Amino acid sequence: EYSKMVSAVFHNRLASGMTLGSNVAWDKEKADDNNYIYDSMAGPYGYGSWDAIPAELREAYDTYTHTGLPAGPVSNPGLLSIEAALWPEENCDYLYFQTDTLGNYHFAKTNAEHEAITADLESQGIRP
């Protein structure tokens, strides 16, 4: 289980003033049963579509451009994730991680390392 290491990456990025850069929030425009952001903003408030939601609300959840935490939850975490958020892996200096389609996690300290991992996963055909 990598929950504590993933949490450490997010803690490290926040402490460094970086964006979170999380695909969890990046896929927010998809209207499906498992999209907390879309379902909680588009439906209940009557916007009807992602594009109808005011830009300032959409941008507040864009973890690739907005620094700090998103404006609100991006999912409904389980106990393991909550515990990892409270107690991330200690002495972990990673700033990036990438998953593959086999369920493995790959961690990197620099963007160059992260891009190399991503390219390798792509070449193996196991990048999500």
What are these regions (language model features)?
Residues 1-128:
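Bacterial extracytoplasmic/cell-wall-associated proteins, especially those involved in peptidoglycan
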